[in-house]
């Protein structure tokens, strides 16, 4: 019943309902069985209309290759689809897209590896309150390019928000004087 209501809402112009229709199709909720191709079509409809959550969900389908290599909408390349839709959602400040886009840039998965772009998107998400992105920004600065002051700042912010991994990093590395004394209180 819920799917039919969401589908009716889409027909009446509620583009946000495309997210719910896509979810129902992807999971099979309210339907006889899941239908990933139908889910992708609903997400694409919302994505093309500028719905950030639909853009993000469509990118996730490309990443997960849930439809198989040959079944992408219009024969689209999953690598191109992933980056395209994640960027569109991230540019609308959709925090989950910012985090995932940064992950993909850092890993070089589905997108050409670009550490500067990863840092940009992690910091953007972190500045919106993402504790995950705060930790990840610290991790990137701790590894490549090495900047212990920035790493310490991001780890500290993540630790202040309750991220246990960031607390552990700060505790373990204070003894090497890699971070400034500001973080001594965390010992």
Residue ranges and their predicted role:
Residues 11-15, 27-29, 48-51, 65-66, ...:
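Short helix-capping/linker turns of helical repeat alpha-solenoids
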Residues 148-164, 171:
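TPR/TPR-like (Sel1-like) alpha-helical repeat modules
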Residues 18-27, 57-71, 100-107, 111, ...:
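Hydrophobic face of amphipathic alpha-helices that form TPR/SEL1-like repeat modules
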Residues 164-187:
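Terminal, low-structured helical/coil segments at or just beyond the last alpha-helical repeat
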């Amino acid at each position: 019943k819920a799917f039919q209501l969401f589908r009716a809402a889409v027909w009446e112009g509620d583009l946000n309902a495309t997210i719910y229709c896509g979810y129902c199709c992807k999971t099979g909720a309210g339907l006889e069985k899941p239908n990933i191709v139908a889910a992708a079509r609903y997400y694409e409809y919302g994505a093309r209309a500028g719905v950030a959550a639909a853009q993000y969900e469509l990118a996730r389908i490309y990443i997960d290759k849930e439809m198989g290599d040959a079944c992408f909408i219009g024969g689209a390349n999953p690598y191109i689809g992933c980056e395209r839709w994640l960027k569109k959602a991230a540019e609308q400040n959709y925090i989950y897209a910012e985090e995932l886009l940064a992950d993909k840039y850092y890993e070089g998965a589905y997108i050409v590896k670009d550490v500067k772009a990863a840092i940009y998107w992690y910091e953007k998400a972190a500045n919106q309150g993402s504790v995950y992105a705060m930790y990840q920004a610290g991790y990137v600065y701790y590894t490549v390019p090495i900047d212990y002051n920035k790493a310490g700042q991001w780890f500290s912010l993540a630790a202040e928000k309750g991220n246990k991994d960031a607390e552990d990093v700060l505790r373990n590395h204070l003894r090497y004087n890699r971070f400034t004394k500001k973080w001594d209180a965390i010992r």
